[in-house]
Design a protein with these regions (language model features):
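Periplasmic peptidoglycan-binding/tethering modules of Gram-negative envelope proteins
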Residues: 1-10, 82-84
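Periplasmic OmpA-like peptidoglycan-binding domain that tethers envelope proteins to the cell wall
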Residues: 14-84
Length: 84
């Protein structure tokens, strides 16, 4: 795995939600999603110092929240490899 072998790489983990529920609950849920991915990767051998986790709640949708399909797409975690 790239993050285990390369010291100069990191991973930005971003949690997102749909717009169902309150802003504060969605922010907490999105952070929990990102943290769950971070914890999984740490168990797989990735150093915690290489991982950054963020929760954005419903603030960055990639689809409409007007349909069940769109809301499903917005409930996600995105990861970006970073160079440190």
């Amino acid at each position: 795995m790239l993050l285990v072998k390369k010291a100069n790489y990191g991973l930005r983990i971003e949690g997102h939600t749909d717009n169902v529920g309150t802003d504060s609950k969605n922010l907490i849920l999105s952070q929990k999603r990102a943290t769950a991915v971070k914890n999984y990767l740490k168990k797989k051998g990735v150093e915690g110092s290489k991982l950054e986790d963020f929760g954005y709640g419903e603030s960055k949708p990639i689809a409409t929240n007007d349909t069940p399909e769109g809301r499903q797409k917005n409930r996600r975690v995105e990861m970006t490899i970073t160079f440190r």
